[in-house]
Amino acid sequence: MMKLSISNIAWNVADDDKVAELLVSLNVSYIDTAPGKYFSDIKNVKNEEIIKVRQWWQDRNIQFAGMQSLLFGTSGLNLFEIQTQQPMLHHLEKVCHIGSLLGATRLVFGSPKNRDRSKLDDNSTKDIALDFFNKLGNIAKSEGVIICLEANPVCYGTNFLTTTKETAEFVKELNHKNIRLQLDMGTVYTNHEDFSDIDKYAELIGHIHLSESNLAKFNSEQLSNDQFHIKCGEEFKNLFSNSLLKTDIATIEMLIKDASSTDDYLQSISSAVEASRKIYGVEN
């Protein structure tokens, strides 16, 4: 059975108590997080601080599944610039450690601004990227986590790994057990990708984001009438029922920009959970 998670980028940390109560009532037992949500100083965060956050959620019968926004708060880091690779890997090593202690073992590498290949030809781009992600994969392995590479559409300012197919082919060529494919439904939607092709890459998928373009709210009423999501939902159910997926968690990823109160957050979260179950068949 596919399990449901929701990323806490959707609400303010100050509302954790009420959101946790809601998630329990909805039988949602997982959340994803961004490290900056709880730790303002990634470099110097102590183990006990990380464990405290994990325990707080465990006490409410909720576990961490994954992390995103791995490079949020950094500046000047680009995997294609040799002089910034080592500082970038050092930062990501700490993030992998945080993920490991939280139990958030699926780390989503999106970060379009940190993978700018604009000065490089195709061969140099591939060589540098393969070397960088092999090193990052080894770091992830040492911490018992996986890095999930996310395709980011061109409209987000990305010029490397912009489609699901391209990203899947890169992951396959890299061939590192701790580097997997991140399946992002917002990317599939934005790029108008043929979701029926996803079964070709299903075994590479390490994590899944149920999302809309630009992280718009995952609204039950709206998605119920969206033929693209309905079609993708049917394909998604087939992937899982045929045991083609190697991951068993799908995460709602959205921003709630128009919320003026805690109740607004809670209502949007409830609607997103309903949509995920109705359209994508994610049960709990």
Describe each model-derived feature in a short phrase.
Residues 1-5, 13-27, 58, 89, ...:
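Histidine-acidic metal/acid-base catalytic patches
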Residues 6-17, 46-54:
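N-terminal-biased segments
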Residues 7, 41, 83, 155-158, ...:
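Conserved short-loop catalytic and cofactor-binding motifs
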Residues 10-12, 35-37, 70-73, 113-115, ...:
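Active-site-proximal loop/turn and secondary-structure-junction residues that shape catalytic pockets
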Residues 17-18, 76-180, 190, 263-268:
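Active-site acidic/histidine proton-transfer and metal-coordination neighborhood
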Residues 29, 33-127, 244-251, 256-258:
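Structural motif corresponding to the early beta-alpha repeats
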Residues 30, 148-149, 182-183, 251:
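Generic enzyme active-site microenvironment
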Residues 49-59, 132-140, 197, 235-239:
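Catalytic-core regions built around general acid/base machinery
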